[in-house]
Amino acid sequence: MSLQRIVRVSLEHPTSAVCVAGVETLVDIYGSVPEGTEMFEVYGTPGVDIYISPNMERGRERADTRRWRFDATLEIIVVMNSPSNDLNDSHVQISYHSSHEPLPLAYAVLYLTCVDISLDCDLNCEGRQDRNFVDKRQWVWGPSGYGGILLVNCDRDDPSCDVQDNCDQHVHCLQDLEDMSVMVLRTQGPAALFDDHKLVLHTSSYDAKRAQVFHICGPEDVCEAYRHVLGQDKVSYEVPRLHGDEERFFVEGLSFPDAGFTGLISFHVTLLDDSNEDFSASPIFTDTVVFRVAPWIMTPSTLPPLEVYVCRVRNNTCFVDAVAELARKAGCKLTICPQAENRNDRWIQDEMELGYVQAPHKTLPVVFDSPRNGELQDFPYKRILGPDFGYVTREPRDRSVSGLDSFGNLEVSPPVVANGKEYPLGRILIGGNLPGSSGRRVTQVVRDFLHAQKVQPPVELFVDWLAVGHVDEFLSFVPAPDGKGFRMLLASPGACFKLFQEKQKCGHGRALLFQGVVDDEQVKTISINQVLSNKDLINYNKFVQSCIDWNREVLKRELGLAECDIIDIPQLFKTERKKATAFFPDLVNMLVLGKHLGIPKPFGPIINGCCCLEEKVRSLLEPLGLHCTFIDDFTPYHMLHGEVHCGTNVCRKPFSFKWWNMVP
């Protein structure tokens, strides 16, 4: 879509003009008018549609052959819908009349050359590119929306390169093109027109920092044929007509949506009249396309697993073996980060979050590297970044981070409906402080990044009461065959005390926690009776329960949950330096691989040969068709304030729902 162009005609000599197919041209007949003119007639050769617009109140009418009263408010509108075969092969003739003269007072002739110009992309995400029915200057969300989609080309398809694909101005391998979006410039019209007219592809300096364009200028199977023409320091490019009527471009994103960047990028092509050597070229027509950079999307634990990651460290051989067996049962790949690479940093959940980006032509997994920068800090970039696996990170300029900036404090819910609004990709959950308080929060650059993705609007929970301060310490999600398709699990001191009281009433008060723990240092056992008589422990867990209850209400409101969607998992906490840590291995901090759950072995009281905590958890989860495997993480993880989820990570299958079909 382009603004109407005005062409002025003359009585002294014929005028020539270029018009674009389907675009209206206003013909100004008032600049040169014979004296005594009262009426005019206008005539066009076949293929030229002429309309008269009398005024704002009356709609336009076809000119036909009748005479029109000469009135300065009248507009003459000319439209051609097919490109010309030759220069000036169509024309419009205006004759000026007086009631006192039988013959026309004068004639004005406008010769027209029509050219069809369109800059197109995959406008409606399904491959249809009909520019007649959409405003390509807009990007519209929803199933009936339209607009192009651009991937941030943040993988590394050529293993011999040291940087990501979009970090330079070259195409290093042909596979790199699969991560780019195609943009096509089509022109139809007389070839001679382009002897003194030119086409310029251009963008703003702002957008040039966020996307770049390659023009195919040679054989498609040769990397050197892809010339970098826009992006970074280049904002305009005169397009040579190398392939006649169609020139193809490949576009890649450089930046994800973020603070100050909505994700929208515009490209324009302008036809310029360069026929006069004494003047600069003048614009005739501009066509525009708008791309939205695809957001980074998180995957909830209810989606099918594809690959499990775990670190091998000095004292976790049995743990790694147990995770490997669970991955085998779930039918997913296992990747073990060796100790030489992790340098005894086992918290792989905290180091990174595995998500994806998606366009109609390509889905690309992308790892989000946390700013925690422990000994694992090189693993995402050196080992996960590669062909068809992208990488992104955000770090504060002053590099000041807290424990909340680890990605055990970054989760996402399954799809939900809350307060009448659908969230088909779920909502991101991050931990912070209470509103108005001065406690710890996730660093601003990470929060800005998450909010800017738009498709999974974040919910901030209260975690500052926890020593580590991660949302995965008190909640998780598991798949379910009914209801909303999932259950939210919440750690519950109240449920644990209730369970222990029931066992005490049945005469099992002497049953011991922590029996059978294998550790370098002897772990002191404690009985149910001792737990239930410890007033400090009881009072502290009442406080913990109040903190979890606060989050429960926030989650019910923001995720649209009812009590039947929530399962309370028995759990106790203890205080360390006025913050909470798990009293026994934290049961909700589990690894979810489809129907297979890897749950921290709690070492709870043994009653009739069974751990009553394990038995209770099984009774809550197995009716959902889930299989519970309890993994001993006591020494290598629990004693270091982490559990199974903290020590593992999962790459999951993307949502079947396409993000561009939602309305944020």
UniProtKB/Swiss-Prot annotation:
Main location: cytoplasm
EC number(s) reported in the record: 3.5.3.15
Reactions catalysed, as given in the entry: L-arginyl-[protein] + H2O = L-citrullyl-[protein] + NH4(+)
Tissue specificity remark: Hair follicles, and epidermis at very low levels.
Superkingdom assignment: Eukaryota
Chain segments annotated as coiled-coil in the UniProt record: none
Subcellular location: Cytoplasm
Keyword annotations from UniProtKB, A to Z: Calcium, Cytoplasm, Disease variant, Hydrolase
GO CC annotations, alphabetized: cytoplasm; cytosol; intracellular membrane-bounded organelle; nucleoplasm; nucleus
Enzyme class: hydrolase
Impact noted for substituting P605T: In UHS1; forms large aggregates; decreases protein-arginine deiminase activity
Gene Ontology molecular function: calcium ion binding; identical protein binding; protein-arginine deiminase activity
Cofactor(s) needed for function: Ca(2+)
Functional note: Catalyzes the deimination of arginine residues of proteins.
Disease: Uncombable hair syndrome 1: A form of uncombable hair syndrome, a condition characterized by scalp hair that is impossible to comb due to the haphazard arrangement of the hair bundles. A characteristic morphologic feature is a triangular to reniform to heart shape on cross-sections, and a groove, canal or flattening along the entire length of the hair. Most individuals are affected early in childhood and the hair takes on a spun-glass appearance with the hair becoming dry, curly, glossy, lighter in color, and progressively uncombable.
Family label: Belongs to the protein arginine deiminase family.
Name recorded for this polypeptide: Protein-arginine deiminase type-3
Species this chain originates from: Homo sapiens
Lineage: Eukaryota, Metazoa, Chordata, Craniata, Vertebrata
Gene that this sequence comes from: PADI3
